[in-house]
C-alpha cells in the first residue's frame, strides 16, 4: 500500500466526518469546498479536513481512491458520501443529519 493511500485511510478512520477539500475550514480555496464546510458548520458537529492543494499527489490519489473525479469529497463513518451537491441535497432532505447523528453516536 502506498504512503499516500495510508494517509488517506488514516484521515478517514481518524475522523467520524472527514472532508478532503481545497484549502481548510477557516480558508476554503473554492466555492464548493466553502459550501460543504458551511453545511457542517451549520450542523455544529466536529469534522476533520484535509487540504488537497498542499499535496498534489494526494489530490490525484483521493480521486482514484473514491472513484469520484471532483473535490471536495466527504466521508462519514468511513464511507464515501459524495461531493458538494450531494452533501447539500442530503442536508436539505434531512438524510445528512441522520448519517451524522448515527456516526457520532458510535464514537467512544
Whereabouts are the PLM-identified features?
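Non-catalytic, surface beta->alpha helical segment in thiol-disulfide oxidoreductase systems
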Residues: 76-106
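Thiol/disulfide oxidoreductase modules built on the thioredoxin-like
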Residues: 64-70
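N-terminal organelle transit peptides
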Residues: 1-4, 105-108
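TIR-domain catalytic/interaction hotspot
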Residues: 6, 59-64
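Local sequence-structure signature of Cys/Sec-based thiol-disulfide redox active-site neighborhoods
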Residues: 9-46
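Thiol-based oxidoreductase modules, predominantly thioredoxin-like and allied folds used
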Residues: 41-60
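Acidic beta-strand-to-loop metal/phosphate-binding motif
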Residues: 20, 73-77
Amino acid at each position: 500500500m502506498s504512503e499516500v493511500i495510508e494517509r488517506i485511510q488514516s484521515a478517514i478512520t481518524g475522523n467520524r466526518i472527514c472532508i478532503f477539500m481545497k484549502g481548510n475550514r477557516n480558508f476554503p480555496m473554492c466555492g464548493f469546498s466553502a459550501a460543504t464546510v458551511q453545511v457542517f458548520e451549520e450542523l455544529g458537529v466536529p469534522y476533520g479536513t484535509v487540504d488537497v492543494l498542499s499535496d498534489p499527489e494526494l489530490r490525484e490519489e483521493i480521486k482514484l481512491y473514491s472513484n469520484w473525479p471532483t473535490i471536495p469529497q466527504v466521508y462519514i463513518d468511513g464511507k464515501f458520501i459524495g461531493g458538494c451537491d450531494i452533501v447539500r441535497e442530503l442536508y436539505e432532505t434531512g438524510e445528512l443529519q441522520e448519517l451524522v447523528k448515527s456516526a457520532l453516536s458510535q464514537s467512544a
